[in-house]
Amino acid sequence: MTMDGPAHMPRRYVTFQGVNVEGLSQQLIARILFHVADPAKSNAFWEHFKAKLADADKTLARTADSLCLLCGAIGYIDELFEDNDDEEGLTILRRLEDELC
C-alpha cells in the first residue's frame, strides 16, 4: 500500500520524484497538530481541518489527500506558525510550498 492506494496503482505525484512527499507532509502535519492540540490555539477551522485530515489516508472516504489539504491551507498554516513563533514549522511550510504546492 502506498499513500495513494494499493501498490499496483500508479502514484499520483510522479512529478515529485526525488522529493519525499510523504515525509515532508507528515512533518508539517505533526507541527500543526502540536499547536492545535491546545484548545486555546484551535478554532472551528482547525477542528474541521483535523476531521478532513483523518479521512485523507482513506482512499475511498477522502475528498482530498493530505498534500492537497496542506496546499489549500498554506495561509492558515502560515498564520498558525507565525502566531506561535514556530520557526521550524515555517521552514517546513516554505519547503513544502516551494517544492510541492
From Swiss-Prot:
Protein name per its UniProtKB record: N(2)-fixation sustaining protein CowN
Function: Is required to sustain N(2)-dependent growth in the presence of low levels of carbon monoxide (CO). Probably acts by protecting the N(2) fixation ability of the nitrogenase complex, which is inactivated in the presence of CO. Is not required for CO-dependent growth.
Record family assignment: Belongs to the CowN family.
Induction note: Up-regulated by RcoM in the presence of CO. Its expression is enhanced in the presence of a poor nitrogen source, like glutamate, that allows nif derepression.
Keywords: Nitrogen fixation
Pfam family, one: CowN
The keyword Cell inner membrane belongs to this UniProt entry's keyword annotation: no
Disruption phenotype: Strains lacking this gene are not able to grow with N(2) as a nitrogen source in the presence of CO.
Swiss-Prot/TrEMBL GO biological process terms: cellular response to carbon monoxide; nitrogen fixation
Superkingdom field: Bacteria
